[in-house]
A protein has these predicted regions:
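The alpha-helix within a helix-turn-helix
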Residues: 11, 22, 50
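Short C-terminal boundary/hinge segments that cap the last helix of small helical domains
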Residues: 54-65
């Protein structure tokens, strides 16, 4: 199962709202909702998040058994 809990923690640590991230990387509300539900998104989106936040993928995504 994919978890984006680390992404939400990273945003909190940086005092950033989800909508700010959405606007900065240019994703749709539907994609933001998928992230919120823990649904799979395109790896390019994950890459763009990592580039924008200047962090590693381990700060964004976690695979839970």
């Amino acid at each position: 199962m994919i978890s984006y809990d680390r992404l939400w923690k990273t945003l909190i640590d940086r005092h950033m709202k989800k909508t700010e991230l959405r606007d900065r990387i240019g994703i749709s509300n539907a994609t933001l909702a998928k992230l919120g539900k823990g649904e799979p998104v395109n790896l390019k989106i994950i890459e763009n998040i990592c580039i924008d936040l200047q962090c590693g993928i381990e700060d964004v995504v976690e695979i839970k058994a």
